Amino acid sequence: MSLAKDRADLERLEDEWMARMQARDMERLEELVAPGFRFMAIHLYPEPMTREQWMEAARSGYTIVSYAFEKMEVDVFGDTGVIHSRYSQVANYEQTNLSNVFRLTDVWSRIDGRWQVVARHSSVLG
């Protein structure tokens, strides 16, 4: 696999992940989000969110009206991809407004030949 192809694949998958969240495409999210996935956002919760919690939010409470990756840098280290991005969204979780600009760090791993996201860290910029 070439480094350029891995970077392009990860950039495409990063955007697809949020598009599938917005569409509540749970079947595709099950494929993209790895077992053991963790989400950390100190501005929301003091402890990491589990995969199960993330998927439940995707299923019912987290509504993305619109989103944009304003900047994305993709690094690949063998079977690990690290994506640093500036991301904005108009969204809410149940009654909480989550519309803002964020700095995201996402970690993807090539597991059994396909990329899956294993971790996300989110910090509010706006």
Could you describe each region identified by the protein language model?
Residues 2-32, 36-126:
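A beta-strand edge to alpha-helix "cap/lid" segment located at domain peripheries
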